[in-house]
């Protein structure tokens, strides 16, 4: 198996930022290419939502090693074998909490699916953002307070709460580890 991936990209002024720690697309998306002869057909592409949390489970399964129950990712093996119908993830969770720090990126967490991105900035502020990824791929127009998106906000807020529980993430945890 040959895997090519990278760290996320830097902002070069997009969204008024330099650096890389925000949930916006410029630093949220990372490249991932895998070559696995006799398993992955050459030229195959996939648009499913995967994340670096999935790499360890994937490599363990490929090596036929038991996957510990406390790992948070999901093996990419079904996707690599072309079995997208076995893939159940339709959204990913993100949390950045190292503020204040040299980077000065505000603490925030969010949920991202193929259509929308919901973000909550917290700690010394309480701001929400919602982006319609299909109609606003540059994430330039925050539609969180737009009444047309009320149902989307409610649905994603509930899914975000569920993901925070799934990953055992909370403000209480922040208070324990972040000063």
How should each PLM-predicted stretch be described?
Residues 1-44, 51:
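Histidine-centered active-site microenvironments of extracellular/periplasmic hydrolases
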Residues 39-49, 62-67, 140-149:
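Active-site rim elements
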Residues 24-28, 48-51, 68, 72, ...:
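Short acidic-hydrophobic sequence patches enriched in Asp/Glu that either
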Residues 8-14, 53-56, 61-129, 133, ...:
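C-terminal cap/loop subdomain of S1 sulfatases and analogous C-terminal strand-loop tails that border
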């Amino acid at each position: 198996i040959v895997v090519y991936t990278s760290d996320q990209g830097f902002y070069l002024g997009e969204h008024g930022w330099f650096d890389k720690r925000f949930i916006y697309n410029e630093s949220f998306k990372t490249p991932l290419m895998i070559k696995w002869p006799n398993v992955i057909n050459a030229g195959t592409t996939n648009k499913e939502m995967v994340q670096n949390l999935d790499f360890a489970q994937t490599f363990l399964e490929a090596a036929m090693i038991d996957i510990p129950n406390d790992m948070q990712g999901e093996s990419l093996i079904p996707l690599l074998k072309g079995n997208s119908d076995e893939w159940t993830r339709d959204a990913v969770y993100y949390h950045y909490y190292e503020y204040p720090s040299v980077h000065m990126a505000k603490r925030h967490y969010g949920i991202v699916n193929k259509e929308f991105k919901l973000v909550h900035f917290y700690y010394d502020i309480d701001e929400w953002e919602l982006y319609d990824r299909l109609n606003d791929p540059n994430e330039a127009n925050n539609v969180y307070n737009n009444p047309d998106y009320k149902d989307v906000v409610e649905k994603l807020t509930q899914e975000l709460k569920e993901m925070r529980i799934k990953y055992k993430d909370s403000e209480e945890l922040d208070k324990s580890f972040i000063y």
